[in-house]
Each structure stands twice: as structure tokens, then as C-alpha cells.
């Protein structure tokens, strides 16, 4: 039972869902993008709030999908091993939602309405979770060094800001959301440990 718990079942499921959605998109053209991409006007004017979640599972191309899924699987597997399947899913989805809300705020402030898709905001949220753990509770991830995580995040942010057509507001928003969620997770774990003592 413990061995099964340590398997990244939720990570694998999320990767599979993203791949299946992308395959459907290749056969249906723009249909899913038209109803699921993060479009500020559609969300804020017409109340299509489901786009805040659906856009997390859409990708702009095979390279976009591949890069995100590789990072999701390996980074997510580390985190899922600590949190368990359901808590990992909650962290992932809330990070993606936080990322997309920040993206919407930026689009309104910058008066931009470029639709965006992708799991990278949620994945940056996982980066934020990991950062919170190594800074606030090293027991959660004892084998990972702060320098390694900070360097990974810095390089990812740099890559985003030096590449065109990247929703950097979602990346930053996801990172901050994930950090706050990771900090909350640390507080809960510490309280449980104190009660057990």
C-alpha cells in the first residue's frame, strides 16, 4: 500500500489528460481553444470563468506540450510523494487558478487581450511549493538544496522573459500562489508533528 502511495499516479493522470486534450485539439481544430483558452473579455465581461481552469489543459503546440509535461512529471512526482495524490492535485489546480487570475489582472492593467493557454502557470506553482518547503521546512524535501531550486526558478523566469509569446504574469502568479500554498502546507505539517509529540 505504501509503495502504491509513493507512485506519482496523479502526475501521470494529469500528463495523460493533457496529452489526450491535445490530441483532441489536433482533430477538432480551434473548437476547444475557442471555448477554453484564457481570454480576458470572455472571462471578465461574459462570465466564462471555467476558462480559468480549462486553459491549464490546453497547449499551443507539441513543443509547448512536451516541455510542460516533462517538467510536470518529474517535478510533480517529487511533490506528490510528500503530499499524496489528492493534496497534490489541489496544490496543482489552485496554483493554476492563481496563475490565471494574475494573468487576467495583468491583461486588464496592460490593456491587452491576448488569449493564453498552458500548464506552465500551475507548474511554476509547484516550483513555489518546493521553494516554500526548502525555506520553511527542510524535512519535507531534505535531499533538495535551496540553491538548486532558486537557480531552477531563476532560469525558468529568465527564459520566459526573454522569449516572445509567453504569459509571464501567469508564471509569476503561479510561483507566488504556489509559495503561499507551500507555506500553508508547512504550517499544517508542523502542527501535526507538534500534536504527535
Name what the model sees in each region.
Residues 1-197:
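A detector for small-residue-rich transmembrane helices and their helix-helix packing motifs
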Amino acid at each position: 500500500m505504501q509503495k502504491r502511495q509513493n507512485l506519482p499516479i496523479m502526475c501521470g493522470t494529469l500528463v495523460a489528460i493533457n496529452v489526450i486534450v491535445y490530441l483532441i485539439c489536433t482533430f477538432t481544430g480551434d473548437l476547444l481553444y475557442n471555448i477554453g483558452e484564457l481570454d480576458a473579455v470572455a472571462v471578465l465581461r461574459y462570465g466564462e470563468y471555467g476558462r480559468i481552469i480549462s486553459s491549464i489543459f490546453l497547449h499551443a503546440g507539441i513543443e509547448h506540450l512536451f516541455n510542460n509535461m516533462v517538467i510536470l512529471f518529474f517535478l510533480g512526482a517529487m511533490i506528490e510523494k510528500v503530499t499524496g495524490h489528492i493534496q497534490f492535485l489541489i496544490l496543482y489546480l489552485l496554483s493554476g487558478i492563481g496563475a490565471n487570475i494574475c494573468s487576467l489582472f495583468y491583461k486588464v492593467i496592460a490593456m491587452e487581450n491576448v488569449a493564453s493557454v498552458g500548464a506552465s502557470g500551475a507548474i511554476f506553482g509547484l516550483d513555489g511549493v518546493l521553494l516554500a518547503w526548502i525555506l520553511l521546512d527542510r524535512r519535507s524535501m531534505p535531499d533538495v538544496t535551496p540553491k538548486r531550486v532558486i537557480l531552477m526558478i531563476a532560469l525558468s523566469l529568465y527564459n520566459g522573459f526573454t522569449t516572445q509569446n509567453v504569459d509571464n504574469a501567469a508564471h509569476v502568479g503561479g510561483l507566488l500562489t504556489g509559495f503561499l500554498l507551500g507555506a500553508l502546507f508547512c504550517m499544517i505539517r508542523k502542527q501535526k508533528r507538534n500534536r504527535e509529540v
